[in-house]
Amino acid sequence: MIQTLTIDQLGHRGDGVSLSQGGATYVPFALPGETVEAEPVQGHPDRRKLLRVEVPSPDRVAPFCPHFGVCGGCAIQHLRDEPYRTWKRNLVIETLAQAGIDVPVDPLIDAHGAGRRRITLHARRGTHDILKVGFSATASHDIIGIDHCPILDPGLNGALEAAWALAEALTPVGKPLDIQVTATENGLDIDVRGSGPLPPKMITSLSQLAEKHKLARLTRHSELVLLRRPPVVAIGKAKVTLPPGAFLQATALGEQTLAELAMAKLGRAKQVADLFCGVGPFALRLAEKARVFACDSDAPAVTALQKAAPATSGLKPVKAEARDLFRRPLAPPELRDFDAVLFDPPRQGAQAQAAQLAASRVPLVIAVSCNATTFARDAKLLIDGGYKLERVIPVDQFKYTPHVELVAVFRK
């Protein structure tokens, strides 16, 4: 049954929200102030599929990507920039308010820069043996085949062509391939997962494809297939050779912005701990000013940091350790010598480590987060432990999505 709905607000996932039916009804791709026609979505009683915009919002703009609305990569290309920025900042404000945290939230910083420098493509042969390579569809496990994505860093030029070639060679049926592609200074770094055991002849074929597409490196489940040139990224003064499948911030400008915000708040700190350090996007920059202790559960990432730090001139000592901070967080006695601690955990946050920090006497804590909800939970622990949350700075590197980064400053 087709319904006519008035959209009252924009939800936290970028959906239009209608409150006219006695409860919240979510309509993807609709905007506040619009009157729309929509139909029910089977199995989702509170969701509707947008059929037509009868009365458009003055804030509506034409999406710039032909795949928008079908591809699940972007949620909100159809909103003017100013209200988009307001909505995204409000995601942080509202999440903190729901947790009972009242703190100044700065204006949103745009850190999209040149675009995304790492992507994960999916590939699978489906009906009639047709191969699809692309991103997941909106709210679905279907694959949307694409040959171009306008939000990618130019360093990923050739990524889609290489992914198609690899998928054609591996002919995935049933379970899809995951093809992670990262832009590096020496070319594309690709790690393929989901292929299962391969005969030597296929490994040779993949090596030839890597040569043809001039990949820096090709790995399969992190095992080397071909190394043409080291996949290197610049982090501050350092050059880091990435381990296969390494985590990086989504954009180069995003990483730089987060690091510069953190460094600006560290003042004259001489001993700094960088927790959940990864390959060192903070540690290698912090070491320009202070001695750094860094740790993370990702042993290959820590090894990459350990190699890069002593090879970079002008840095103070960096000690790095592989350690699972979810199971073995640094305890107050281990934290007592630090002037400042920075932590940048995955989306699940750092509850165990935040509890230990709350019991410590570290005078300055900088939190970096990609999930406002888990940040709010961890921030409450620090506040209850005597820290004052001074400010929160939202950073937008996942542009056109509901995801937002933030940097927060705590003092005791």
Swiss-Prot record:
One of its GO terms (biological process) is rRNA base methylation. Its EC number is 2.1.1.-. S-adenosyl-L-methionine binds at Q249, F276, D296, D344. GO terms for molecular function: 4 iron, 4 sulfur cluster binding; metal ion binding; rRNA (uridine-C5-)-methyltransferase activity. Pfam families: tRNA_U5-meth_tr. [4Fe-4S] cluster binds at C65, C71, C74, C149. Keywords: 4Fe-4S, Iron, Iron-sulfur, Metal-binding, Methyltransferase, S-adenosyl-L-methionine, Transferase. The keyword Cell cycle does not apply. The active site is at C370. Belongs to the class I-like SAM-binding methyltransferase superfamily. RNA M5U methyltransferase family. This is Uncharacterized RNA methyltransferase RPA0948. It comes from Rhodopseudomonas palustris (strain ATCC BAA-98 / CGA009).
